[in-house]
Amino acid sequence: MTNIRKSHPLMKIVNNAFIDLPAPSNISSWWNFGSLLGICLILQILTGLFLAMHYTSDTTTAFSSVTHICRDVNYGWIIRYMHANGASMFFICLYMHVGRGLYYGSYTFLETWNIGVILLLTVMATAFMGYVLPWGQMSFWGATVITNLLSAIPYIGTNLVEWIWGGFSVDKATLTRFFAFHFILPFIIMAIAMVHLLFLHETGSNNPTGISSDVDKIPFHPYYTIKDILGALLLILALMLLVLFAPDLLGDPDNYTPANPLNTPPHIKPEWYFLFAYAILRSIPNKLGGVLALAFSILILALIPLLHTSKQRSMMFRPLSQCLFWALVADLLTLTWIGGQPVEHPYITIGQLASVLYFLLILVLMPTAGTIENKLLKW
């Protein structure tokens, strides 16, 4: 008799994706972030669902409803902080996952990579809209500043912004629609993630060497299921340390002040995970130029497969490319720091230099390094 997990139409899909899946025998902990992202997504959907039961998307009551969740709802405070800090963990895992893809050349799986870029953009949009919902000062002004950037689009800009706002400023209509989108998008993300996985399983996973691992596969279960469980435990440990000991560490104190359209905060800045892009936006004095640089700073990921010049897939055996990769990481950390600083000397200059270096590294230096390494190996 055939095993039910191999014959049942539904169980068969699960079996082929998580149990009998042939996996490379040498994938490191950098390959754990995919499953961690899945856990983050499920966690965010569950905590978000319980928050939505008590939240009201009206400008007069939104701030109070969040306070009510934290003070009056049973364990509301832990649900709220797990959701807020869960977003931070989500982005840490996302950036690690993308970094792994860049380092080991996983972007050569074109469909998987491009769907991943779409996923990144969707998660960023979801997080931005979620930040607006508590209706604190930073929520309101963040929404105003970021949506206002679209007015830089020639001819249709102003109409587009007013259409998104649902009026002539960020108001009740904006908050209501942002709540609606923030609720639906995670389910769309879940669907896209399944397509991401589908395309990955067409080719199989990459591995640190970047060489085909068809000759040496092991079953996903029990080897990588146990490895993923360890990763999940560490993720939950990190999240709960943050939630229980420093819940407001990554937040902005301004968001504990109710939104006031008549009072602009001295430093408007997004959550930490958007600061690198915000720094690139601010480094260009022209509004449209800044918006284009902001968009391109993320969309540049879609160009990465076209910029791959090396005959080797992974950076494992390419020291020159490795140096440039870590320079890129350092540059992104510098941009993150600059994005949180006021617009004054010397931060302006540092931000501009770091922004130029970001694009220079990806578009010029890394492809050049690939070519040089080919020459050195007489390929």
Swiss-Prot record:
Pfam assignment, any one: Cytochrome_B
Annotated residues for binding of heme b b566: H97, H196
UniProt KW keywords: Electron transport, Heme, Iron, Membrane, Metal-binding, Mitochondrion, Mitochondrion inner membrane, Respiratory chain, Transmembrane, Transmembrane helix, Transport, Ubiquinone
Protein localization: Mitochondrion inner membrane
Lipid bilayer topology: Multi-pass membrane protein
Entry note: cofactor: Binds 2 heme b groups non-covalently.
Keyword Membrane (UniProt): yes
Primary residence: mitochondrion
Gene3D superfamilies: Cytochrome Bc1 Complex, Chain C
GO biological process, one term: mitochondrial electron transport, ubiquinol to cytochrome c
GO annotations of cellular component type: membrane; mitochondrial inner membrane; mitochondrial membrane; respiratory chain complex III
Swiss-Prot/TrEMBL cofactor(s): heme b
Regions crossing the membrane: 33-53, 77-98, 113-133, 178-198, 226-246, 288-308, 320-340, 347-367
Binding site for heme b b562: H83, H182
Tissue expression notes: Detected in heart (at protein level).
Subunit composition and interactions: The cytochrome bc1 complex contains 11 subunits: 3 respiratory subunits (MT-CYB, CYC1 and UQCRFS1), 2 core proteins (UQCRC1 and UQCRC2) and 6 low-molecular weight proteins (UQCRH/QCR6, UQCRB/QCR7, UQCRQ/QCR8, UQCR10/QCR9, UQCR11/QCR10 and a cleavage product of UQCRFS1). This cytochrome bc1 complex then forms a dimer.
Function: Component of the ubiquinol-cytochrome c reductase complex (complex III or cytochrome b-c1 complex) that is part of the mitochondrial respiratory chain. The b-c1 complex mediates electron transfer from ubiquinol to cytochrome c. Contributes to the generation of a proton gradient across the mitochondrial membrane that is then used for ATP synthesis.
Name the record gives this protein: Cytochrome b
Underlying gene: MT-CYB
